Amino acid sequence: MKITIEELPELRIAYFRNVGEYGGKQNKELMESFKKWAQLNGVFHNSVILGIPQDDPSITPKEECRYDVGVVLNEDFNVLQPAQVGKLPGGKYAVFLLDHTKEAVSEFWGNIFSEIEKNSLTMRGEPIIERYTSQMIDNHLCEVLVPIQ
């Protein structure tokens, strides 16, 4: 698996949140609702969409797992409801490019910790981020950003 390292600044985001089991139809519906909001508010075109699982499902009960879908915004953008405003911490990330299929994503999550260890990296205690651009979506790809030290 190919890894690139990227340094990100702290990012301001607008996001929608779902609470419940990861990977279900609710997260897909959340993404579709968020895209509609982003289009109506003029922040969808040429944007970077983020999927952010906030909790570790091996620790947090599945019905309490939080999943955010968001878009990066500049500081002066006025975020309208029902979106919320948040910050993503800056720092160093290991970036993995994946086929955006259920099988590839499932395989990634099954191998992530061994890949991090194999590459002598140490994870930070921040959420892992899924990143999508329109070009990636058109090519059935996504990136997963793993926070590292």
UniProtKB/Swiss-Prot annotation:
It holds the Pfam family GyrI-like. InterPro entries: AraC_E-bd, DNA_gyrase_inhibitor, GyrI-like, Reg_factor_effector_dom_sf. It comes from the Bacteria. PANTHER family: TRANSCRIPTIONAL REGULATOR YGIV-RELATED. This is SPbeta prophage-derived putative transcriptional regulator YosT. The gene is yosT.
